[in-house]
Amino acid sequence: MPTVSETSAPSRTSASYYLKLLICILFMFFFSKIVPSWGGITETGIAAIGIFIGLVLMIVLDFGLIPATLMAIFAVVMTGFYDGSAIIAQTIGNSTVVQLIFIFTICNSLIQTGAGEFLAKWMLSRKSIQGRPMLFLFVLLFVGWICGPFMGTGGLVLLYTIMDYIIATLGYEPGSDFNMTARIGLQTACMLGTAFLPFKGITLAIYASISGALEAAGIQTNYAYYMIFSFLIGVLYCLGFMLLMRFVFRVDISRLKTLDVSKMEVMQNLRITPQQTISIIFTALAILYTLIQLIIPEGSFKSWYNSITLWLWAALMLAILSLLRWNGKPVVNPEQLMGRVMWGVTLAVAAFTVVGGMLSNNDLGVRTWLGSVLSPIFGGMSFPVFVLVIVIVATVITNFFSNLATGLIIGSAVAPFCIEYCSNLGINGTFICLALVSSCMFAYLTMAACGPAPILLSQEPFVKKPGYIWSHGVPPLILGIILIWAL
């Protein structure tokens, strides 16, 4: 419902809205007509800079991902760098964009069938972890990490429901250190978990901001290595936070000895359905395609296997999953699954891939100019220091600013240097992508950090103690920075 102030001055709101929109359009379509070339950048290169600035501004100013990206794609065609047919191949026809659609769809089957929720409940209700405070706490945090890539905000809601049961059963106050610190741990673990799948949602958009430039320079990245090390970061973070909670914050967890989560009403009669089993199997098969590539020996079979590509394999898994029936009913509804695709993020990946390709194109001069400008900052850095700077800057900024915009801006800015490090030192660019994505997803200190941040910060204990998130949220942030950089 609109407030009085919103309804009393519509002209002022409209004027502000259209003024901002006009500025974005000027950047996208007229920047190269107004601003003369500099630093050896061609007119098309100047236009690419304007499109990038206009696209980021439209996203930051909340004009929406879909209109912003469609306008940017049209602006690219207007530069003459691509024609209408070529832009289709570079955007919607790009394998990265297509795989995002199918991977996102098949992963959503875990939500549609309830398989993701079952797995979370199953792990937390194991008898082996009941009455063992440290072990239970680790599993709770790890389940939070798993919820990130496979359940999203729905997983956080489930975990906070379990936390409500724990504090009520054990007599902890809502404002107790145990309750508030554990919730920070769950939120941060979940956010780190969202970085696990590099071919899904916002993660892919940020990943592609660097990988797109690397691939344009002939440098390939590897999803399998990415996921393996992202998993290690997640496990080590859960262990590290557990130790922080116990030995640094000195939170009393002794009451967990008497806790039995399996007695919760939502944990009763916990049985997996055939539909959930099938969904888990096919989602795992889709993801394992990339990991299997690491163990197949070189030869004709590996060449054939690689020719299938991840997007086509995921599409096949989705097709088979959609055809399967149980008791006369489909296991999943493919139309509903496809309807849940985040088209805004998908188009953002497409648009930034194209614009990023223009910015990194040697013939347009932007990459050379950007290198000369930033070389005093990055030029003399060793590779470890370079990555550390990226991790610190991205992690700090993303906690005050949109994590998607942060990742896209930083990724585009450092991509030319990533190319140099990879080309000259033989560095695997996958790990630079992992560092940036993990840093940008580690957002939770302020409401503006990311979409799920208000789920934590709007809870009553954090509203009553606004400083708590800083005193107990910054140390985990430092822990995350160290782990992301070290791995």
PLM segments and residue spans:
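Hydrophobic transmembrane alpha-helices of multi-pass small-molecule transporters
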Residues: 1-99, 225-372, 472-485
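Membrane-interfacial loop-to-helix junctions in multi-pass transporters
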Residues: 43-47, 93-97, 125-139, 172-183, ...
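Membrane-core helix-loop-helix motifs of multi-pass transport proteins
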Residues: 11-13, 165-258, 262-273, 428, ...
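Short helix-coil transition sites and intra-membrane helix breaks within transmembrane domains
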Residues: 60-67, 95-96, 107-117, 146-161, ...
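Short amphipathic alpha-helical coupling elements at transmembrane boundaries
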Residues: 89-90, 118-128, 165-168, 336-339, ...
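Hydrophobic transmembrane alpha-helices that form the pore/transport pathway of multi-pass ion
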Residues: 124-217, 403-439, 462
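C-terminal transmembrane helix pair
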Residues: 170-173, 226-234, 347-355, 359, ...
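Hydrophobic, membrane-inserted alpha-helices
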Residues: 25-28, 50-56, 139-145, 186-189, ...
